[in-house]
Every structure is written in structure tokens, then in C-alpha cells.
Regions:
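Juxtacatalytic substrate-recognition/specificity segment
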Residues: 30-164, 170
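A short beta-strand motif characteristic of beta-propeller blades
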Residues: 305-312, 349-355, 398-404, 444-449, ...
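Beta/coil-rich, acidic/histidine-enriched accessory regions frequently appended to metallopeptidases
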Residues: 35-38, 43-46, 222-225, 250-363, ...
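Hydrophobic beta-strand positions that form the internal "hydrophobic ladder"
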Residues: 329-330, 371, 421-422, 482, ...
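Outer-membrane beta-barrel initiation region
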Residues: 298, 314, 320, 605-717, ...
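Transmembrane beta-strand segments of outer-membrane beta-barrel domains in Gram-negative
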Residues: 723-855
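A flexible loop/linker signature enriched in serine peptidases of the S9 family
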Residues: 191, 315, 333-342, 354-361, ...
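Acidic/His/Gly-enriched intrinsically disordered linker/tail segments
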Residues: 34-39, 108, 125-130, 138, ...
Length: 856
């Protein structure tokens, strides 16, 4: 134990200096966010308003106008409950890729949207959800831009806010508050869906409340609801007991007084204690959910389930079950300890068929010993242009077949009549989606070189509805029509498309209740729907439109399989309501039902209880109060005003090559994570193709003074790296016979050119790079003192080199530290370009192989 005595102001100064050092150290080790590159052939345009600069590909103009209206409207309301307004910020749009995501970073500050609608999204437009969630993050950062933090940010640049938020504001608040915003300011939101409740409710009822640190930080061993789920309930509960503006107060106090130790959990006019709030929240939710459990157990009509016994060592999910034969089920297994894997379950024993780590949306279809699915496919050079290929895997022959390439397809399904015909959802580079029918037949091709554009496979492309996203198509029983879920500004509905005529007919009205996973059996359409706060199985008579609930589990389900007892139609061949009711009593189900150990497989009978799809579900906890507090809903009524048009201009890449966003009163080498005495300046453009760092470094050893510059440009296919520095060096050597003291200036520069190529297989990501580099070093002597000998100095030194890099690494599970399988090879050759040449050759290889223990 030690004590510091002296002037209190000196103690405060010391604390400030320590925290100041920690901020910049955090900035170094967190590095700056450099995104993957878009295709350099894209021409960019921009829309500028007082709130944002929207940058997007030129072919995305119509959708960019709509998104600009959304952002402009959201910016007026999104920061109110944080006591701030949205600052002006760049927004970069990535299209023409299979990724669906949003990102906010603050060094340099920007939002990035990957706008391809995912089929497993809830009942709300994908880009609208991105706007609400990510813009709330912007306001969180702006709420920190006060007091001493604002002063430091004005002086040193954008990385100050990023460092303050990363060090002092918990991630659960950042993500949970953003989920609260998307829920409170939309007719739905993730906090409104049954998923969040299901995950947290099962944990509290069956495992109990974990200690706060474990609940907040997560666990590699036990399943803990993530920062989004945990954070949503923490933030919503905090507002319910402290009021709407609780976090406006906490963030302001943190921003102004962090240097005094008033960090997030100790900030506010009435200090906020997150650990105390967690205890109160857990107790409150537990009482509510114990009451719900008691009511469910007392119900007469609920699913009688028989669990399919599978040995579980840890939290594991089994989804997308499909029964094959009498005793076997294929399903998708996933956990943090292993890769997403296709498994065969027979009499309680699990046999791994194939790891499918890049399978999209946990979805596949099955027919005659083959599974059909969509898989992530890496672009050879441009990281933002990834595709989603359709793959067929014959697990009996253990062979893959590539069905499509160089396009984006989701949710492929076999035709029930002709296995050589499949349907899928195709997304183009403008985010327009359509239902496509493909006929690869028996001529599946193994190479992408032959099947580049999927030509000669299309039978039809239907269902191109404006501003509509599709998900989970299924065929009619005669294979002549497609049923599909449509998502629009009005929510989700189910539609039918006649393939021959393209005619569309609506089966359900649009609703913000989430629905997914369509299947048709014996004249009934089955799907998963939000039923009174849980995801349950519902079916609809295609003849009468009457609907019934087929399951009622404790927490909800994610997927299902219908394994009905054979039932014959009446003499007319029709399915009357009476025959349907009689048949439903014979329908056996396999459900992927949730509990605290993950999604398990259970057997159950269809319940066939009448339900009205138009009856509204009860509001989840907190949602009504949150919406009243925010006082703004982004819904379909927002689309009524179509008169607003924004001026669009070309976005010049050369004119925006440099964006100086931050500097530091230290030497900071972000690439090498090095920190020292000096000063550093940073620039990075919006497209992440131009990254510049330069500054001054002082070294108390032999290099007294150094000016340095590093620059990376990745806007062309080759990637160029330039590094140069100018040093003032000195050296003193002493021995019994002689003393040498030398001073000289040293100028070193190098140019590196890399040609990368990336591809992936079913289980590995592979990269190969060819590297060429040139460097020179020039010495300018300033002083040389040696009384005994003369020394010759090589004042100019040039080198040229070539390199080869190859990495083939298996996909990693969440808990993996390094890949289980893989190889990394590096070859380097370098020669001097002088009168007395010297050569250098190196080879290194790193091999990853499994061991007795997992690398976790």
C-alpha cells in the first residue's frame, strides 16, 4: 500500500495525465476502423444536408433519395431522450453484397450501412431499422461531447470521443440504448419481438440471475444473453424507475467529470449504479415471468412435448429439423464451442455430416438425400462485394455441387414435383428482390468459370414488388405456385404468386407481428408467428382461410418439421374444414423449442386451436411507456409525403482522398501498436482506400529525432504501401583501443505493392498475395570523430524484393483462439542494387492441426 501526499491540485493533475495517457493508449490498441473496399469501378454520388452527407453508388439513386428522407426525419427526433441533437456525419452505403449490417465508428467518424435486406429480419424495413439504431449511436457519442471531453475532442480530434466511449461507457448501454430507440420509435423493433424476451426469460427462470460482472461481460463457458439483449432490458428498466432522461444526465456527467472518477456507473446528479439496477431488474422480471410460467403450466391447452434425448455438454442449438425415414432427423447444430454443422440424429445419437460455417441464415432445404442452401462467397479482391451462392450437398455421396455463382441468392427450396427445379430469392445491386425459378437440372457444374452469370438456368423471375423484401418461399403442393413472406413499410404479409401468369394474391393482411418459415402440407400453410409474445406454429387453411395455433411451448420455437400420419382426402379430393380438423389431430410435429440450454428438438402433436391473426398481441414490458416518452414513430405514414427531393452530386474520389480526423501529442504507430514520445497526425478517407499517418518521434537512444510517414492506398486492384522516415542519428562506441563518435542523417523510403486474391471453400478462407517492394536508404554524415582509423560509410543503399503469401485457414468457432486446421506460408527474396550485391531469402510456415484439447 502506498500514499501520495502533497498539493491536491497536483494530485488532480496527475490523475488527468494518467487518464489522458490511458485514452491515447486505448486509441492505439483499439486501432482505427478501416473497412474493406468496394469495387473500384463504382462511381459514387452524394446527398448533403445539415445532418449528414450520404455517399452511395450512382446506380442506387432512387433508394438513396428514400433513405435520405428517412435519415433527415430521424435526425430531428433520435437524440431527444439523450438531451442532444444529432451532429452532422458522413453515411456510406454498401450495396451489391450479401452482408446485412450497420456500423458506427468515430475515428474517423462515419456510419456505414450494408443495405441488402436479410430474410430473417423482423417485420420492418431493413434500412429504416439501420437508420434508427445507428443514428442513436451517433447521438450517444454526441452526448459525450461536453465539458472537458469536448475540449479534448476539439483539440486532438475524433479519436478522443471514441476512446472515452470505449473506456468509460459500457457496451451494454451503447447497444441496449440503441435497441430501445429502434423499439420506441418504430411500430416494432427487436425489443418488441419475442426473441429478446425468450432468451432472457429462460435464463432467469432456469439458471437464475448471474452475478453482474458475468451478465455484463459475458462468458465463454455459459450462455449469457448478449449486449443487445442484456442492454435492452437494463436500459429500459433504468428508464422505468429513473425517468426518460436518466442517461442524458449520466452521459453528461461522464463527459464533464470523468477525470474526477465520475465514470458511467458513478455519474449523474443522483449517482447511477448499474449493479444495483441489475439486481432490481432481475428481481422484477423474475416475478413477472414466474407468474407467466405459472399461468402457462395451469393451461389445459398447451403443447405436450416429448424431448428427443440428445446429450449436451454445453449450450447448443438444434434448428431446421427435417425427418428422413422413420427414426432419423437432419438438423443444423451450432454452439460457441463448434462450427455450424449439419448433423444426422438417430435414436438420440448425433452424427456430424458436414460443417457449414458459411451457410446463410441457418436455413437449408432437403430432398432425396441432398440438402440445398445459400452460402457466403468471398470476392477475389473487393471485400464489400461478397456473394451468396446456392450449393447442393449430397451427404450420402459426400459431394458438393455449385448451382449458382456471382450473384446473391437466399432461401433456396426444391420444387416438390420436379427436383430439378428450385426457387430462391435473388437480390440485385440496387437491393431489389425477386422470386426466381431456376432449372439447373442434372447439369450441375463444379467450376465457377463455366457458370459465371447463372445464364441458361432461369425459367422465370416473378414478384418484383417495389419496396418489398422477400423471405422463406415455399412451393404449392402441385409445384405451380410460390408462397412467400413480404416485408414492407406496413410490416409482413404472406402472398401467393402463380408462376405461369405472375399473378399475385394476398393471404394475410400486413402486420408488424413477425412471421417466418413457410411450409405447405395437405392444403394448409404453416408458418411461425408472434402469438401473445412467443414464436409459435400457426397454420392456415388454403381453402377457407381459417387459422389455428399448432403449438404452445413455454418460451417459443425457431423452426419445425411436419411429420403427419398419412391422411387421405375425401372423394372430391378437397380439404374441407371438417377433414382438416380431423387431420390436424393426426399431425405430428418436430419443434425446435427453446430453453436455457439452447434450442432443443421435441416431438409434439398439432393443437389445432382457432386463432384470429388480426387480433393484436399484448405489448411487451416497457414498450408502451418508451414510445410515449419518445413521442415519435417512424411508420408507413411517413411515406405519404413524396414531394421531398434532395440534390444529388457526383462524389469525387480524388477530392476526398484525405480526411485529417485526429492527432496526438504522442508518437502512435497504429499498425505496429507502438507508443512513444513525439506527435502524430492521422487521415483516413470515407471509402477506407486512403490511410495516412505522419509525425515526429523522439528516441532517447541512438535515434534522437525522427520524422515519419506511412501511407496505404487500396483503391486499385494492387494495394500500395509507402513508408518513409528521416532520422537524425548518433552513435558512440568505446573500447580500450579506440573511441568512435558519429552523427549522421538517415533517409529511408520504401514502396510495397501487393496483388491479393481471396476465395473460400465450404470450410476455409484462402488468401494468396504476390508482393513486390523497393527501398532505399541514404546516409548524410554530419560528424565523425575517430583519431585512429578512417571509416568508409555506405551512403546509398537500394534493395528490391519479391514475396509470396499463402494462407488456408479453417473457419473458427466463437470460442476458438486459432483455427483448428490451416497453413500459412511466407516466402521472401531480397537483393541489393549496389556494386557489391547481397541476397536474402527467407521461408516460414505455420501449420495448425487439432490437438487433444481444443484451442479454446
Amino acid at each position: 500500500m502506498f500514499y501520495i501526499h502533497g498539493n491536491p491540485s497536483a494530485s488532480i493533475c496527475g490523475r488527468v495525465l494518467l487518464l489522458f495517457f490511458l485514452l491515447f493508449s486505448h486509441a492505439v490498441h483499439a486501432q482505427y476502423s478501416v473497412s474493406a473496399n468496394d469495387d473500384n469501378a463504382i462511381k459514387w454520388r452524394q446527398i448533403q444536408t445539415k445532418s449528414f452527407r450520404l455517399v452511395y453508388p450512382d446506380f442506387y439513386e432512387a433508394d438513396a433519395q428514400k433513405l435520405a428522407r428517412v435519415l433527415d426525419t430521424v435526425s430531428l427526433h433520435i437524440g431527444n431522450s439523450l438531451g442532444t441533437t444529432a451532429p452532422r456525419i458522413p453515411v456510406l452505403i454498401h450495396t451489391n453484397g450479401s452482408k446485412s449490417n450497420g456500423l458506427l465508428v468515430w475515428a474517423p467518424k462515419r456510419m456505414e450501412f450494408w443495405t441488402t435486406p436479410p430474410p430473417d429480419h423482423y417485420a420492418y424495413p431493413w434500412s429504416w431499422q439501420l437508420a434508427l439504431h445507428e443514428y442513436r449511436h451517433v447521438c450517444q457519442m454526441q452526448a459525450l461531447n461536453k465539458g472537458i471531453t469536448k475540449c479534448l475532442n476539439a483539440v486532438f480530434g475524433e479519436h478522443i470521443l471514441g476512446a472515452v466511449s470505449g473506456l468509460l461507457v459500457p457496451l451494454w448501454f451503447m447497444e441496449g440504448d440503441a435497441v430501445v430507440a429502434e423499439t420506441a420509435m418504430s411500430p416494432t423493433g427487436r425489443g418488441h419481438t419475442p426473441e429478446y424476451k425468450m432468451l432472457f426469460k429462460a435464463q432467469l427462470l432456469e439458471k437464475g440471475a448471474y452475478k453482474f460482472d458475468k451478465a455484463k461481460l459475458g462468458s465463454r463457458r455459459d450462455y449469457i444473453p448478449n449486449q443487445y439483449v442484456f442492454g435492452y432490458y437494463m436500459t429500459a428498466f433504468s428508464r422505468s424507475i429513473y425517468g426518460r432522461d436518466v442517461f442524458a444526465d449520466v452521459m453528461e456527467s461522464t463527459a464533464k467529470h470523468w477525470w474526477r472518477g465520475a465514470w458511467f456507473s458513478k455519474a449523474g446528479k443522483r449517482p447511477y449504479s448499474d449493479s444495483r439496477v441489475y439486481e432490481q431488474m432481475a428481481d422484477s422480471l423474475l416475478r413477472v415471468w414466474e407468474t407467466e410460467r405459472k399461468q402457462w403450466l395451469e393451461k389445459e391447452n398447451k403443447s405436450a412435448i416429448e424431448e428427443i434425448e440428445i446429450r449436451k455438454r454445453h449450450y447448443t442449438n438444434y434448428k431446421n429439423p427435417i425427418q428422413i425415414g422413420q427414426d432419423s432427423i437432419i438438423a443444423l447444430q451450432s454452439s460457441s464451442f463448434g462450427l455450424q454443422t449439419l448433423v444426422l440424429i438417430t435414436k438420440g445419437k448425433v452424427h456430424k455430416l458436414r460443417s457449414l460455417p458459411y451457410l446463410k441464415h441457418s436455413y437449408f432445404d432437403y430432398k432425396d438425400g441432398k440438402v440445398l442452401y445459400s452460402q457466403e462467397s468471398a470476392n477475389q479482391r473487393w471485400g464489400q462485394q461478397n456473394n451468396a451462392d446456392i450449393i447442393e450437398y449430397d451427404f450420402r455421396k459426400k459431394k458438393y455441387r455449385l448451382v449458382t455463382s456471382d450473384a446473391i441468392f437466399f432461401n433456396p427450396v426444391y420444387n416438390p414435383v420436379d427436383k430439378n427445379i428450385i426457387a430462391a430469392i435473388e437480390t440485385d445491386r440496387k437491393d431489389n428482390q425477386s422470386l426466381v425459378i431456376l432449372s439447373p437440372g442434372n447439369k450441375f457444374l463444379y467450376t465457377k468459370n463455366v457458370l459465371q452469370k447463372n445464364k441458361h438456368q432461369y425459367i422465370a423471375s416473378i414478384g418484383k414488388e417495389n419496396d418489398v423484401a422477400f423471405s422463406f418461399p415455399c412451393w404449392s403442393e402441385d409445384g405451380k405456385a410460390l408462397y412467400v413472406i413480404e416485408t414492407s413499410v406496413y410490416g409482413k404479409c404472406i402472398a401467393k404468386y402463380d408462376i405461369a401468369t405472375g399473378k399475385r394474391s394476398l393471404l394475410t393482411a400486413s402486420s408488424y407481428d413477425d412471421i417466418s418459415r413457410l411450409q405447405i402440407r395437405n392444403g394448409r400453410l404453416y408458418f411461425i408467428k408472434d402469438v401473445k409474445g412467443k414464436y409459435e406454429l400457426v397454420s392456415m387453411s388454403l381453402e377457407s382461410g381459417a387459422c389455428t395455433v399448432e403449438s404452445d411451448t413455454e418460451y417459443g420455437i425457431s423452426s419445425y418439421c411436419i411429420t403427419e400420419t398419412p391422411f387421405h382426402d375425401d372423394e372430391t379430393g378437397n380439404h374441407s374444414d371438417e377433414t382438416v380438423k380431423e387431420r390436424n389431430g393426426n399431425v405430428d410435429l418436430i419443434l425446435s423449442a427453446y430453453n436455457s440450454d439452447g434450442f432443443r428438438l421435441v416431438r409434439s402433436k398439432a393443437m389445432a386451436l382457432p386463432v384470429d391473426l388480426n387480433e393484436p398481441n399484448p405489448e411487451p414490458l416497457f414498450v408502451s411507456d418508451l414510445r410515449k416518452e419518445e413521442g415519435f414513430i417512424l411508420d408507413a405514414s411517413f411515406m405519404n409525403d413524396t414531394t421531398v427531393a434532395y440534390e444529388s452530386k457526383p462524389y469525387s474520389k480524388p477530392a476526398h482522398l484525405f480526411n485529417f480526423h485526429s492527432w496526438a501529442p504522442f508518437f502512435m504507430n497504429v499498425t505496429k501498436q507502438d507508443l512513444g514520445i513525439g506527435v502524430s497526425f492521422f487521415s483516413q478517407n470515407l471509402l477506407s482506400t486512403s490511410v495516412l499517418q505522419f509525425g515526429y518521434k523522439y528516441n532517447p537512444q541512438d535515434i534522437k529525432h525522427e520524422l515519419y510517414l506511412t501511407y496505404n492506398y487500396s483503391g486499385f486492384y494492387p494495394i500500395f504501401d509507402v513508408e518513409t522516415n528521416y532520422k537524425m542519428r548518433s552513435m558512440l562506441l568505446s573500447s580500450d583501443t579506440t573511441d568512435l563518435y558519429a552523427q549522421w542523417n538517415e533517409w529511408m523510403s520504401g514502396l510495397n505493392m501487393t496483388l491479393p486474391y481471396t476465395w473460400n471453400t465450404q470450410r476455409t478462407v484462402n488468401k494468396v498475395s504476390l508482393v513486390a517492394n523497393y527501398s532505399f536508404r541514404k546516409l548524410v554524415p554530419r560528424k565523425l570523430i575517430n583519431p585512429h582509423e578512417e571509416f568508409r560509410i555506405l551512403d546509398l543503399f537500394n534493395t528490391f524484393g519479391l514475396g509470396f503469401r499463402l494462407s488456408m485457414l479453417s473457419a473458427q468457432a466463437y470460442n476458438d483462439i486459432v483455427p483448428s486446421w490451416g497453413e500459412v506460408i511466407k516466402l521472401n527474396y531480397k537483393t541489393t542494387l549496389t556494386s557489391n550485391p547481397a541476397e536474402y531469402f527467407s521461408f516460414s510456415s505455420t501449420t495448425y492441426v487439432p490437438f487433444i484439447f481444443k484451442n479454446q
